Amino acid sequence: MISVLIPTYDYNTLPLVTELHQQLSVADIAFEIIVQDDASPLNSNTDNNQKINLLSDCRFERNDTNLGRGQNRNALIQKAQFDWVLLMDCDMFPKSKGFIQNYIHQIQNSNHSVYFGGLQY
């Protein structure tokens, strides 16, 4: 159903992924969450992000070389296995517990190609 793609660089994305994973699990749909670090230095953020691999249908990957923002996003899109893609910045967080459900509702009940909103920095 949906691939959630999160490019990152030297940022702890575990809290975001944990929240999204919980919401996606409640929605009871097929999903994957992929976080891709763009070759940032190895540190505590990398250690925290490795824990993403412990969540079902989630994975953390790290580029060997820095691709830059655009190429990192494009690389993530190439890895997506579902037709619907939700691109999120690593420093965003859903404003509500219904964030994912709102997106799923729109996907299933309208014919638009692009949706945005419901986030805060």
PLM regions: where:
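Nucleotide-sugar donor-binding loop of glycosyltransferases
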Residues: 8, 37, 96, 118
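N-proximal low-complexity "stem/linker" segments adjacent to membrane-targeting elements
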Residues: 1-22
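Acidic donor-diphosphate engagement hotspot in glycosyltransferases and nucleotidyltransferases
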Residues: 16, 44-45, 73, 96-100
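Glycine-rich, basic loop-to-helix element that forms the pyrophosphate-binding segment
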Residues: 63-80
